[in-house]
Amino acid sequence: PAQPFRFPKHPQGPQTRPPI
């Protein structure tokens, strides 16, 4: 299913915000 814009998942787990 189409999901909202999301940053690529990191190896540690899914992340919904950009790396700071």
Curated annotation (Swiss-Prot):
Keyword Nucleotide-binding applies: no
UniProt protein name: Antibacterial napin
Subunit field text: The mature protein consists of a small and a large chain linked by disulfide bonds.
Entry similarity comment: Belongs to the 2S seed storage albumins family.
Any GO molecular function: nutrient reservoir activity
Lineage per the UniProt record: Eukaryota, Viridiplantae, Streptophyta, Embryophyta, Tracheophyta
Keyword rRNA processing: no
Alphabetical keyword list: Antibiotic, Antimicrobial, Disulfide bond, Protein synthesis inhibitor, Seed storage protein, Storage protein
Function (record text): The small, basic, water-soluble napins are one of the two major kinds of storage proteins synthesized in the seed during its maturation. Inhibits cell-free protein synthesis. Has antibacterial activity against Gram-negative bacterium P.fluorescens, and the Gram-positive bacteria B.subtilis, B.cereus, B.megaterium and M.phei. No antibacterial activity against the Gram-positive bacterium S.aureus or the Gram-negative bacteria E.coli, E.aerogenes and P.aeruginosa.
GO biological process, one term: defense response to bacterium
Organism: Brassica rapa subsp. chinensis
Span list, region Disordered: 1-20
Top-level taxon in the UniProt lineage: Eukaryota
